[in-house]
């Protein structure tokens, strides 16, 4: 995507005056229309967001906006030292595949080391989080049913748009909407 397309997209998201299919990134509107039959997205297609807390990149490939209610899939960059706070999903199983980096994974208060190529499975209702004091992380995440993608849409912003300034209470309220709780 060229700079002009990115600036245009950022502007459209900022004014919020268009319907979702008109404002979605390249490939997502096509995927949304094709969801009942399935779809194929290229490497640069999908919904790109910037995390509200650590400004890491999130790339949603499959989720509720593309017609999948049973599965969400994407990648998340976790910047050096940012970690992921302890939380749980009341209705969703979650899995991570570590594409880059290493750190400590906390699952129900037990600490586990992980590294590139590792896999983490989290059954619903399990408290979990990450610490990455030495490396930036790139994680592939899968949720079933979909839901995490909606949390990201409600808390994060497209590239080029200022991050949302959310209070802990606002984050917890949004999390509850997606059957998620933070400690």
Segment roles from a protein language model:
Residues 47-86, 92:
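A short glycine-rich, His/Asp/Glu-containing loop-to-beta-strand
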Residues 25-54, 160:
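C-terminal segment of N-terminal export signals and the immediately downstream linker at the start
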Residues 78, 91-105, 142:
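Short, conserved beta-strand element in jelly-roll/cupin
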Residues 153-183:
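Acidic/histidine-enriched, glycine/proline-rich intrinsically disordered or flexible terminal extensions
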């Amino acid at each position: 995507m060229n700079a002009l397309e990115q600036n245009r997209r950022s502007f459209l998201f900022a004014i919020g005056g268009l319907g979702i299919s008109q404002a979605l990134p390249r490939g997502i509107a096509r995927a949304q229309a094709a969801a009942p039959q399935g779809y194929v997205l290229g490497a640069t297609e999908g919904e790109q967001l910037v995390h509200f807390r650590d400004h890491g990149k999130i790339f949603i490939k499959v989720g509720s906006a593309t017609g999948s209610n049973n599965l969400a899939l994407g990648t998340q960059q976790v910047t050096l030292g940012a970690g992921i706070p302890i939380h749980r999903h009341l209705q969703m199983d979650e899995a991570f595949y570590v594409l880059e980096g290493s750190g400590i994974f906390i699952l129900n208060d037990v600490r586990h080391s992980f590294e590139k190529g590792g896999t983490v499975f989290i059954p619903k209702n399990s408290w979990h989080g990450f610490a990455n004091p030495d490396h930036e992380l790139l994680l592939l995440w899968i949720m079933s049913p979909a839901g995490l993608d909606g949390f990201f849409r409600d808390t994060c912003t497209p590239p080029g748009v200022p991050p949302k300034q959310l209070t802990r209470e606002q984050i917890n309220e949004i999390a509850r909407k997606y059957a998620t709780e933070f400690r």
